Regions:
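Activity-critical C-terminal alpha-helical subdomain
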Residues: 127-227
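Glycine- and acidic-residue-rich phosphate-binding/metal-coordinating active-site segment common to enzymes
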Residues: 73-173
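Charge-biased C-terminal accessory regions appended to nucleic-acid-, cytoskeletal NTPase
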Residues: 1, 214-274
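Context-gated lysine
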Residues: 8, 12, 25, 69, ...
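RecA-like P-loop NTPase motor core
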Residues: 3-117
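Generic preference for well-ordered secondary structure
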Residues: 37, 48, 134, 138, ...
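Sequence-level detector for tyrosine residue identity
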Residues: 26, 39, 64, 71, ...
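Generic detector of well-ordered alpha-helical segments enriched in charged/polar residues
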Residues: 2, 6, 94-98, 151, ...
Length: 274
């Protein structure tokens, strides 16, 4: 983001803004919402190309892009997004990340944790990033989701609209228990009994709030692999203006936060259409 955005005060709605340093041409550092970058980083065309958003698959990237557009519109920011969505291909995402990290383009990378419990170990893909520092470093931003995968933080109203019959009676889709949606496997589904086993496996009591409930009742339905795709079809059918109604800053706080991250990286250019 350029100086004009800072001057208009719009930077308050973003995670950060870029300040180009014309004195130290090599500097590249992040501090309290400011990414300071020496002009040398923009002398090569690679440094001025649209930023890359690296995710495990294209559909994840498309969903984050939709979230970023919706975030901008919710803040009445009439600017567009320019993002090059790239797919890492699951476990090979780390290889793609490493190549980008050696390059000259600015990029952000968001991956699933695949954790089924707060105390669980990271999944196979996320484990490969053990040595990578989260947050800002040099030309990139990196984050492992604070939940199982992207399906766990899709806007509540979107999932409710797309799968209203399927989620009926399932506890994590009751607003009272929505926080427990974070680690349940939406693809495989989870019963109360299975949640207890997961607690025992990891030596925790995360799901203990459901201890008095019959174990054969559903915590989360089995969506299979099509939930994200179905949600994306519905999301794409909405105008950006109407999409705002399906995102709640309180219920969907993790989604809104990530949408802000992606919007901060890709904002610029012509205004969004409503």
């Amino acid at each position: 983001m350029g100086q004009s955005i800072e001057e208009k005060g719009l930077h308050k709605d973003f995670l950060f803004f870029v300040r180009v340093d014309f004195f130290d041409k090599y500097v590249l550092s992040f501090d309290t919402g400011v990414l300071s970058a020496g002009y040398q980083h923009f002398s090569d065309s690679a440094g001025t190309q649209e930023i890359i958003l690296l995710t495990e698959n294209d559909l994840d990237g498309d969903a984050y892009f939709w979230g970023a557009k919706t975030y901008l519109n919710s803040k009445k920011i009439r600017l567009g997004l320019s993002i090059d969505i790239q797919s890492g291909g699951g476990n090979t995402t780390y290889d793609r990340f490493s190549r980008l990290d050696r390059g000259k383009r600015f990029f952000a990378c968001i991956i699933d944790s695949d954790k089924d419990h707060p105390k669980a170990a990271l999944g196979t893909t996320a484990k490969r990033f053990d040595s990578v520092t989260s947050g800002f470093q040099d030309r990139r931003y990196f984050e492992v989701l604070p939940c199982h995968e992207i399906e766990n933080i899709l806007p509540f109203a979107i999932v409710r609209e797309v799968a209203k019959d399927k989620i009926k009676g399932e506890f994590v889709f009751d607003q009272k228990f929505l926080e427990y949606r974070m680690f349940v496997d939406h693809k495989a589904g989870v019963t109360i009994g299975q949640a207890r086993v997961i607690d025992q496996l990891h030596g925790g009591s995360y799901f203990s709030v459901f201890d008095d409930i019959e174990e054969d009742l559903g915590l989360c339905p089995k969506f299979g692999g099509g939930l994200l795709e179905s949600c994306m079809k519905f999301m794409d059918s909405l105008s950006v203006k109407n999409a705002i109604q399906y995102v709640d800053e309180s219920l969907d706080k993790d989604w809104v936060r990530l949408s802000k991250v992606v919007a901060s990286w890709g904002v610029g250019g012509r205004g969004l259409r409503s």
